[in-house]
């Protein structure tokens, strides 16, 4: 199929529709803030529609991927390599954030007295019991019941059950073929539902952006513009610098990858939620040649353990507060901060407002930096969350391709075809290509 025949009119492109919707949302929120804040249900509704479908999609993808594998040892290898990659990249993100905030020093010269700050707004984030310990976090991965995990949309709990189900189905051998076929076909129905939901993505992006600008205003951007600029710059450095090097070492270009997921990036920009494109990212990673089992394990796990954007935010925000309140931090204190963040950032994975919760817990644990300083960045946190979500999204996509490459589960020919031809039907209609390219994977026959 030629590129020309695959092109859609601009007004039918999801990319163009989301750009238009976000622009209108910004204008409405700025000029009619009261009306803009009333658009919040549109954004919330879209995100709820996506969350409705995430758990069953993860289940189907993981089960089909694992049950269809010949070597079960590869599942453990994939998981181990993924966790190793996540830890290394999270550490690099923390270090990059620490380096940039020390070089640019966005908080220097503000001379804020912590005692003069209104801390009422941060009470909800710093209340005792909000932060999970490591043991509590691990126990929370085990659901009280399977139904409860799916009903609440707990990604890690659903993932655990899906892995166990996939192993059991594989062990069942040929007797499980009927179950396997049903789950595989059901997954295609679910992705068709995703396609239907994505048609209203521009409406969701419009509502979320109108609410954000209407509630917080563009003025809050300018009041702490130096921190905002430094943070966005750091995210760009990490994506195109650090992830760029990682991508190049593994045989693909991060620039082409970002172009490939441009629609998903715009939706995340509008909704400030990387979860809003999780199902579509899973489709696109498979379309780039990553094996279903790798996609099913890495993407959902990455949403809890591979939060590169959040890691950058944590070190930058902590040191910014110290700079703004004239609180000196020695090199040893900053290294200690880094070490504590390596632990605490994992404990808050998947928790709403996790950035503030982790930051508050870390500042309390390290000592020296006033927790009250969180009030300084409360007003712009929503705008910073967009950069966090965008960086997290790119990071998880790159992680999937890299881990797939390491385990030998990445079709490099399909990868380069997908990245070099972003306007083909594969990019516009991923599920249609999935139907054509994914062949039936028989459940392994039981061994006598």
UniProtKB/Swiss-Prot annotation:
One family name in Pfam for this protein: SDF
The answer to keyword Cell membrane applying to this record is yes
Keyword Cell inner membrane part of the UniProt annotation: yes
Q: Which cellular component, as a GO term, is one annotated location? A: plasma membrane
Give the way it sits in the membrane.
Multi-pass membrane protein
Residue ranges spanning the membrane: these are 13-33, 49-69, 81-101, 149-169, 193-213, 227-247, 294-314, 336-356, 357-377
The protein's GO terms of the molecular function aspect are: fumarate transmembrane transporter activity; malate:proton symporter activity; succinate transmembrane transporter activity
GO terms in the biological process aspect are: L-aspartate transmembrane transport
Where found, per UniProt? Cell inner membrane
The record's annotation in InterPro entries points to:
C4_dicarb_transport (IPR023954), Na-dicarboxylate_symporter (IPR001991), Na-dicarboxylate_symporter_CS (IPR018107), Na:dicarbo_symporter_sf (IPR036458)
Task: List, alphabetically, the SUPFAM superfamilies matched.
Answer: Proton glutamate symport protein
Q: Keywords of this protein's UniProt record, alphabetized? A: Cell inner membrane, Cell membrane, Membrane, Symport, Transmembrane, Transmembrane helix, Transport
Report the sequence similarity comment from the record.
Answer: Belongs to the dicarboxylate/amino acid:cation symporter (DAACS) (TC 2.A.23) family.
The role this protein plays is: Responsible for the transport of dicarboxylates such as succinate, fumarate, and malate from the periplasm across the membrane.
Protein name (record)? C4-dicarboxylate transport protein
Q: Identify the gene encoding this protein.
A: dctA
């Amino acid at each position: 199929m030629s590129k020309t025949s695959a092109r859609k009119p601009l007004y039918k492109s999801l990319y163009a529709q989301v750009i238009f919707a976000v622009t209108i949302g910004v204008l409405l929120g700025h000029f009619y803030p009261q009306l803009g804040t009333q658009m919040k249900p549109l954004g919330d509704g879209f995100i709820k529609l996506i969350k409705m479908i995430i758990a069953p999609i993860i289940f189907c993808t993981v089960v089909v991927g694992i049950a269809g594998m010949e070597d079960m040892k590869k599942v453990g290898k994939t998981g181990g390599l993924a966790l190793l990659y996540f830890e290394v990249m999270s550490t690099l993100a923390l270090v990059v954030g620490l380096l940039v905030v020390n070089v640019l020093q966005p908080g220097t010269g503000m001379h804020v007295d912590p005692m003069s700050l209104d801390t009422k707004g941060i009470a909800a984030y710093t209340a005792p019991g909000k932060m999970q310990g490591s043991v509590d976090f691990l126990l929370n991965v085990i659901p009280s019941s399977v139904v409860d995990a799916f009903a609440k949309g707990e990604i890690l709990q659903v993932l655990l059950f899906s892995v166990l189900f996939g192993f059991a189905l594989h062990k069942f051998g040929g007797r499980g073929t009927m179950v396997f076929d049903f789950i595989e076909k059901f997954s295609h129905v679910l992705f068709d539902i995703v396609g239907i939901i994505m048609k209203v993505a521009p409406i969701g992006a419009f509502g979320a952006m109108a609410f954000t600008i209407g509630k917080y205003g563009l003025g809050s951007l300018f009041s702490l513009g130096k921190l905002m600029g430094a943070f966005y710059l750091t995210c760009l450095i990490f994506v195109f610098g650090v992830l760029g090097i990682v991508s190049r070492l593994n045989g693909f270009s991060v620039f082409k990858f970002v172009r490939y997921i441009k629609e998903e990036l715009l939706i995340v920009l509008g909704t400030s939620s990387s979860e809003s494109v999780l199902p579509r990212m899973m489709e696109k990673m498979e379309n780039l040649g990553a094996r279903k089992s790798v996609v099913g394990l890495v993407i959902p796990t990455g949403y809890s353990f591979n939060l590169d954007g959040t890691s950058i935010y944590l070190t930058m925000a902590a040191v910014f507060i110290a700079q703004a309140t004239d609180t000196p931090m020695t090199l040893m204190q900053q290294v200690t901060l880094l070490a504590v963040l390596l632990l605490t950032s994992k404990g808050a994975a998947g928790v709403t407002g996790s950035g503030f919760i982790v930051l508050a817990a870390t500042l309390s644990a390290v000592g020296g930096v006033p927790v009250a300083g969180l009030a300084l960045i409360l007003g712009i946190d929503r705008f910073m969350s967009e950069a966090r979500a965008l960086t997290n999204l790119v990071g998880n996509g790159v992680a999937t391709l890299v881990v797939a490459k390491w385990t030998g589960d990445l079709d490099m020919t399909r990868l380069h075809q997908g990245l070099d031809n972003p306007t083909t039907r594969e990019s516009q209609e991923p599920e249609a290509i999935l139907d054509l390219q994914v062949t039936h994977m028989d459940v392994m026959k039981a061994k006598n």
